[in-house]
A protein has these predicted regions:
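Solvent-exposed, non-transmembrane regions of membrane-associated and secreted proteins
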Residues: 1-147
């Protein structure tokens, strides 16, 4: 008998300098059903979100659960319509690693303290987050799995 290794198997790609484009972005996110095309930058603070969507630092750069935040109003409202997505809608991510298409599986309202959807996964998926307008204690969370 061999000992069991604890915890589920997860996929993870380390963010390395070669995964940045010359313009400083990590890639481009497209959601045709809401007419969105936005570049993704590293970090979820004010500087990256003023340029586009922000990749959560410490989450995977490709394999596994790729996590992205975006504003939903104001100067940049890139994620203003993500709560209107439907199961089966397509999300496409293009990075130096390639292009991957995802299919939306859930659109949920979560507490702003709920970090469970940021956790690494075994399957390739993308998770989008944005604020809920006039409800600062909540976030919209969209999960889509690789096709």
């Amino acid at each position: 008998d061999y000992p069991t290794v604890g915890g589920p198997v997860t996929a993870f790609t380390e963010l390395t300098p070669d995964l940045y484009y010359s313009d400083g972005s990590l890639g481009t996110l497209k959601i045709p059903s809401i007419g969105l095309t936005v570049k993704v930058y590293e970090g979820t603070g004010s500087a990256p979100l003023l340029k586009g969507a922000g990749h959560f630092t410490g989450t995977t750069a490709w394999a596994g659960n790729y996590c992205v935040a975006g504003h939903n109003r104001g100067v940049r409202n890139d994620f203003g319509k993500i709560h209107t997505l439907h199961t089966g809608d397509t999300i496409t991510l293009t990075t130096p690693m390639g292009t991957r298409s995802y299919s939306v599986t859930s659109v949920t309202k979560i507490s702003d303290t709920d970090t469970s959807m940021l956790e690494a996964t075994a399957d390739n998926c993308i998770t989008l987050f944005t604020c809920v307008e006039n409800q600062p204690a909540y976030r919209w969370c969209v999960r889509a799995v690789s096709r």
